[in-house]
Amino acid sequence: MQTPTLGQLATENGAQVVGDPDLAIVGLAPLDQAGPGELSFLSNPLYLQQALDSQAGAVIVSAADLERVRAEGRADGRNWLVARNPYVCFARVAQRFDRAANTDTRTGIDPRATVAPDAVVPASCYIGPNVVIERGARLGERVRILANGYVGAQAEIGDDSLLYANVSVYHDCVVGARAILHSGVVIGADGFGFAPDIGATGVEYVKIPQTGRAVLGNDVEVGANTAIDRGAMADTVIEDGCKIDNQVQIAHNVRVGAHTVIAGCAAVSGSTRIGRFCVIGGAANFSGHLNIADRTTVSGGTSITKSITKPGGHFTSVFPFLPHGEWERNAAIVRGLTRLRERVVALERRLRGQAAGSQPSQD
């Protein structure tokens, strides 16, 4: 990759250079570690002092933060890349410097791979060692499937998608264009569906065949060891632009709306529908058969047990952490709340009775 100049990066990202546009940018680094020739960014005014002290060759800033730097008398003689959204600008510049994405130009099928004769694998694809592609599977252009991947019968993988090592896409499932599936992802395993048959000797759980699919839209990224189960009859659907972190469980028949982000270890129970542009914190969990409105934010560790109908809300159910002894004392109080409520209700009744008895006679 040719080393870009600050001016080139500005042109590519709709930003403005304050300083030397011919400065060669050789890499990216945090504010407190960057050196000459490296680009960093400031997206939070709390780190303004780090930006002032940084040895970075240039810093991506907003116009407002650059004015704060000027107010400190520290802007002159330095290089700034002024962007409407410094964090987004940094992300796009980082894509340019992503060596893993930009240097892997391999194509072809590794001789150790197994590809069904009727599978569609364009010449622009790369199929790594020990990959198995079953009958009728269809890959788009420039798909890369790294070592030990599995694509089931009749499954589809869209153009420019990347499946890291040990990713499994089960039969009939669909992965859209430009997907990134990290190692250990499983798309389309059976949903957790069993019918309880109660007999004289106990309960037998009868497996319900999961005949739906798991369908991922375009530009979806799924983190390591996440499972997205196939539907029982209808499909499980992850819409365009969703970003799902590591170790997330998406159960059968769930639908996640476009451009929703879900952080690590969250779990969504069956048939729940999450709206568009939602933000789900780590270890949040959802009961089944719920409807969650668009643009809902759920804090990490929160349990959602009822539908949310109003868009744009922020919900939290986590008790803040405390020193252990204080937490135990509070827990003891919580255990006694039912008895305390009963006492308060009884006292209120007595007071109302006393008030009624003390009123003057109307005779």
From Swiss-Prot:
The keyword Lipid biosynthesis applies. Pfam families: Hexapep, LpxD. It comes from the Bacteria. It catalyses: a UDP-3-O-[(3R)-3-hydroxyacyl]-alpha-D-glucosamine + a (3R)-hydroxyacyl-[ACP] = a UDP-2-N,3-O-bis[(3R)-3-hydroxyacyl]-alpha-D-glucosamine + holo-[ACP] + H(+). It is an enzyme of class 2 (transferase). PANTHER family: UDP-3-O-ACYLGLUCOSAMINE N-ACYLTRANSFERASE (PTHR43378), UDP-3-O-ACYLGLUCOSAMINE N-ACYLTRANSFERASE 1, MITOCHONDRIAL-RELATED (PTHR43378:SF2). Homotrimer. Keywords: Acyltransferase, Lipid A biosynthesis, Lipid biosynthesis, Lipid metabolism, Repeat, Transferase. InterPro entries: Hexapep, LpxD, Trimer_LpxA-like_sf, UDP_GlcNAc_AcTrfase_non-rep. One of its GO terms (cellular component) is membrane. Coiled coil: none annotated. One of its GO terms (molecular function) is N-acyltransferase activity. HAMAP family: LpxD (MF_00523). PROSITE patterns: HEXAPEP_TRANSFERASES. The active site is at residue 252. Its EC number is 2.3.1.191. This is UDP-3-O-acylglucosamine N-acyltransferase. Pathway: Bacterial outer membrane biogenesis; LPS lipid A biosynthesis. GO terms for biological process: lipid A biosynthetic process. Belongs to the transferase hexapeptide repeat family. LpxD subfamily. Catalyzes the N-acylation of UDP-3-O-acylglucosamine using 3-hydroxyacyl-ACP as the acyl donor. Is involved in the biosynthesis of lipid A, a phosphorylated glycolipid that anchors the lipopolysaccharide to the outer membrane of the cell.
